[in-house]
C-alpha cells in the first residue's frame, strides 16, 4: 500500500505525484504498462467529452472533463519522463516560450489593433517557427489525425490565405454540382467511388466555409436531427402496436415523413 497524503483540496503538484505513484513499481499494474498508443484513444475521447461540456454550457461537467484531459496530458508526460526524454516541466517550458514568441504585441514591440488581426500574425509566426517556407509546407503540416471535415476546412483556409479560392459561394456551389455529377458517374461505372465521394465532401466543406458554417457542427446537428426523427418514428410505430422490423420501407417512410413535419 502506498501512503498518499489525504487533503480537503488537491492541486497540480498532487496530480503529478499521484500519476508518478500509479506508474511506480509499487503502483497500479495497469497504469505501469500503458503506452502512448494504448491510451491514445482515451485522450481523444476525453477531449471530445470536454468539447461536449462546452457545447452544452455545463460548467460542472466541464470542470470534470478538463480534469480528465489534464490527467491524460500528465500521464503521457509521465511515460516520457520514465523514458528519460522529457517531463511536465519541459512541456510547460515549451508552451510558455511558444506563447511569448507568438504574442509580440503583448510581450514585445509588435502591434495588434484588434482581435481580428491576431490570427494572421499567429499563423505567420507559427510558420516561421516550424520552418514552413511554402504554403504547401503549411498544408502538409495540418494534422492527419484530425476528423476529415475539420482537416479539409483547415487546408482550404490556408490555401485561401495564399489566394487560391473560389470567388464566392455561387462558384463553390457550381463546383459541388460538378463533383456530384462525377460521383454519380463513378457509381454507375463502379470505379473511383471513394475518390469522387471525397471530392464531394471536400467541395461541401468549401460551401460551408463561404457560408460561415462549421462542417463538423453542421453534420453533428444533422445527426441529432436524425436521432430525434428516428425516435419519433419508432414511437409512432409502437403507438400502433407495431415494430419497425415488421414494417415495409413504404410504411416506415410514411412515419418518417410524419416525424419530419413535427420537427
List the predicted regions and their residue ranges:
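Flexible "arm" and connector segments at domain edges
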Residues: 1-65, 71-197, 201-263
Amino acid at each position: 500500500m502506498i501512503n498518499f497524503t489525504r487533503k480537503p483540496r488537491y492541486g497540480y503538484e498532487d496530480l503529478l505525484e499521484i500519476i508518478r505513484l500509479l506508474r511506480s513499481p509499487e503502483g497500479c499494474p495497469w497504469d505501469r504498462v500503458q503506452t502512448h498508443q494504448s491510451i491514445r484513444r482515451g485522450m481523444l475521447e476525453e477531449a471530445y467529452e470536454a468539447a461536449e461540456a462546452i457545447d452544452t454550457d455545463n460548467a460542472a461537467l466541464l470542470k470534470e472533463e478538463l480534469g480528465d484531459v489534464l490527467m491524460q496530458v500528465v500521464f503521457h508526460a509521465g511515460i516520457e519522463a520514465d523514458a528519460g526524454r522529457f517531463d511536465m516541466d519541459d512541456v510547460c517550458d515549451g508552451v510558455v516560450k511558444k506563447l511569448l514568441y507568438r504574442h509580440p504585441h503583448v510581450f514585445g514591440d509588435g502591434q495588434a489593433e484588434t482581435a481580428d488581426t491576431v490570427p494572421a500574425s499567429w499563423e505567420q509566426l507559427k510558420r516561421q517557427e516550424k520552418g514552413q517556407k511554402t504554403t504547401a509546407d503549411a498544408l502538409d503540416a495540418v494534422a492527419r489525425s484530425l476528423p476529415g471535415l475539420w482537416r479539409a476546412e483547415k487546408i482550404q483556409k490556408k490555401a485561401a490565405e495564399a489566394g487560391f479560392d473560389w470567388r464566392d459561394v455561387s462558384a463553390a456551389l457550381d463546383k459541388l454540382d460538378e463533383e456530384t455529377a462525377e460521383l454519380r458517374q463513378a457509381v454507375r461505372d463502379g470505379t473511383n467511388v471513394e475518390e469522387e465521394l471525397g471530392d464531394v465532401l471536400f467541395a461541401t466543406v468549401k460551401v460551408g466555409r463561404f457560408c460561415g458554417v462549421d462542417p463538423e457542427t453542421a453534420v453533428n446537428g444533422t445527426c441529432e436531427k436524425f436521432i430525434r426523427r428516428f425516435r419519433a418514428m419508432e414511437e409512432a410505430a409502437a403507438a400502433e402496436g407495431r415494430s419497425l422490423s415488421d414494417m415495409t420501407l413504404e410504411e416506415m417512410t410514411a412515419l418518417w415523413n410524419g416525424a419530419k413535419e413535427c420537427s
